[in-house]
Amino acid sequence: MVTSQQSTAAAGSVPLELPYYGAPIGVAVKRFFTKYATFTGRASRSEYWWWALVNYAVLLVLGILALVAGGTPQVSVDGTVAPPAGGAIVVVLIITVYSLATIIPGLALTARRLHDGNFSAWFILIALIPGIGGLILFILTLLPSKPEGARFDQGSPQYS
């Protein structure tokens, strides 16, 4: 079933207020930063999962750089641990800045993804349940879009 919004996506750009179903990777990343702290509205699965892939790839590369730069602790024979090399400290600082810069938009994107499945953004807090919370949130973000999720859009009566 093709919705009017999906046919709009084929013809041109999708308004930021609407989810972009079938978003390409570049558009998904651009929308992630454009909607930096927007917790209202919805995000399609492609918007969410393309960003997740890019985010994990960036963190993987930075983590490898930290290890290559001397981030593994070196234990000597007498049991003392040498401090990490200066390069590793720089990379860890970059990882910290990157993580701080993407935590708010990451939470906003997750909230919008939950909205698209017709769940409240408060379901993000389920990730705080030890052990199973993260898995439950992961499954919720995998679920397909529901038309009822439109109630979270900015023009809906809930936000009027």
PLM-predicted stretches and their roles:
Residues L93-T96, L100-R113, A121, G134:
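Amphipathic alpha-helical interface surfaces
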Residues S4, L59-I103, A127:
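Membrane-helix interface segments in multi-pass membrane proteins
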Residues V75-S76, G133, G149, Y159:
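A broad, structure-centric signal for solvent-exposed, well-ordered loop/edge residues
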Residues L53-G63, G133:
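Hydrophobic alpha-helical membrane-insertion segments
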Residues V2-V54, G106-W122, I139-S160:
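Membrane-interface extramembranous regions at the lipid-water interface
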Residues L67-A69, G134, L140-T141:
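Short, charged/polar low-complexity linear motifs in solvent-exposed/disordered segments
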Residues E47, W51, A88, V92-T96, ...:
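Residue-level signature of transmembrane alpha-helical entry/exit and packing/kink sites
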Residues A127-G133:
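Short hydrophobic membrane-inserting alpha-helices and related fusion/pore-forming segments
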